[in-house]
Amino acid sequence: LANYNTNLKVNPPLRSKADRDALRNAVKLGHVDCIASHHLPHESDSKIVEFEHAQYGMIGLETAYAVTNTAVENLTPLRTVELFSINPRKIFGLETPTIDINQKICFTLFDPTIEWTPQKQDLKSRSANSPFLGKKLQGKAIGTLHPNAISLFV
């Protein structure tokens, strides 16, 4: 926060490097059950003010996979799906979807090999309060399959 980037003003606040390293290690060791984006978009007016007056929050949905994949080395695709989809469903008592004939599906397609640098014009959100704009990330969500629509982002 040395440069007072209001896109980094979040609650709970960002922690020390040691805390972030411990969190990465906890994910690697399987001590973290799930990851959520806590997507909290804001209009630019609420973020282009003095740090103390800026709203808490950042967008996270569009970069959640890439940021996690970048931050946690050697995260397998299966572990990623567990953290973002399977385990949250278990925690909240939701049915886990199955793949079967005539079964409606809802999937996110991701490619862990894509290296990219998010830019404001890449975002689908109406908000752009992301601290990851201009930062190199590894892995990208490339599309969604839904009963009513197929969307590809590449």
Q: How should these model regions be labeled?
A:
Residues 19-23, 95-96, 130:
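A generic local structural motif
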Residues 8-18, 55-60, 130-137:
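A short acidic, glycine-rich active-site loop
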Residues 1-3, 45-49, 120-122:
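Short acidic, glycine/serine/threonine-rich loops at helix termini
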Residues 50-53, 104-154:
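C-terminal cap of metal-dependent C-N hydrolases
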Residues 16-25, 64-70, 137-144:
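Short C-terminal domain-edge/linker segments immediately following a structured domain
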Residues 25-29, 34-35, 40-112:
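His/Asp/Glu-enriched, well-ordered alpha-helical/loop segment
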Residues 1-35:
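Histidine/acidic residue-rich metal-binding segments in metalloenzymes
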Residues 5-8, 79-82, 114-119, 123:
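N-terminal start-of-chain detector that recognizes signal peptides
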